[in-house]
Amino acid sequence: MATLKTDCRFFRGTVPCGPHKKHQVHCVDEAGRPCSHYDRIGKEILIIKLGAIGDVIRTTPLLRKLKDVHPDSRIWWLTLTPEILPKLVDEPMAFTLPSILYLQSRPFDLLLNLDKDREACALAEQIDAKEKKGFRLDKGIVVPATAESEQKYLTGIFDDISKANTKSYPVEIFEMCGFQFNGEQYVLDAPEPPKTPWTLSGKKRVVGLNTGCGARWTSRLWADKNWTALARALKRKGYEVVLLGGEQEHAKNTKIARAAKVKYFGHSSLQMFMSLVDRCDLVVIAVTLAMHVTIGLGKKIVLLNNIFNKHEFELYGLGEIVEPSKPCRCFFKPTCVNPGYRCMEHLSVEHVLSACVRVRKP
C-alpha cells in the first residue's frame, strides 16, 4: 500500500487506472521503479458555477488562466449542466446529492464560488479548502468571500452601481479570482456533426437569426415583422438565411420562414443547435444562451441589447452591439416599463442590417 501513488492524475481508487488496463503497469514495479505514466497532481481547484448554461459558458475563460498559472492542477467544476463543460475540466460534476457528499468529504487547495445562489454559497461554506474566493454565507446572508469580490457583489444589489459599471463579465470574474483578464477566450468543445448534414448551399455566406430571448424577458423581444424584413433584406444581399431557436420559438420561426422564404430546421438538442450555429458565418441574436455559443465558436455576431449594461459583454472583436434609438428604462426588467412606447420598436431593421454588413466585411 505504501507504494501507491494516490496523487497521480490517473489513480482512481475504485477501479484500475487507464495505464494499468492498457499497459499492465503498477505505481511502482517489482524493481522499485516508478510508473512511467505517473503524473503528479499539483493544486486541486474547485469551481462552483451552477447557473444557466450561458453563464457557465461565459465563465470558461477562467480555465485558460488557471491552467496557465497552475499547469499541473486538477480542475473540478460543479454545475447543473456538466454536459456543456469542455474537456479542459478534469472532473465535471453534476449538482446532485452524491456529488455534494463527495465534495464535502475531500480537501481542495482553491475553491472559486462564482454563484450567489444560496445553495452554492452554503456548499462553499462546508467544503474544506485552503483558499476560498467569490461568494460565501455569513449568518445565512450571501456576502463576498474576499475584498476582490466586493465590486461584483455591489453591482448585484444596487441598480445604479450596475448601470455605471464599465467592466465586462470576464474582467469581473477574473478580478474576483485574483487575476487580470488579458483577452482569454471562451473554451467550448467543437459540437458533434449532425447525422444528416444541414442542407445549406455551401456557396453563400450563412447568417443565422436567433429570434427568441426566453419567455420571461418579453421586454427584449424584437417584433416578428422585423425579423421577417431582416431575413428578406439579407437574402437580397446574397446571404443564405437560417432561423435559429428552441422549442419556445418554433411557432414564430415557422411563421417567419414561410413569410421570408428562408430555412428553418426546427428545434433539437443543444449539440445539434451548436452544430447549426457552427455552420453560420454571422449570427444576429439577443442576450441568450445562443449568444455565448456563438462567441464560443468564434462566429461573427450582431447583438441586440436594450435592458442590460452593454459593457457587460465581451465580444472579442467578433461584432457589434446594437441598441434602440430611444432610451430604455427597462434595466433588468422582464416587461417593458417605458411610458408610451416599447423601446425595441425603435431598433430599426435598417440599423441591424447595416451592422450585419459592417461586421461581415473582411
What are these regions (language model features)?
Residues 1-362:
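Catalytic machinery of carbohydrate-active enzymes
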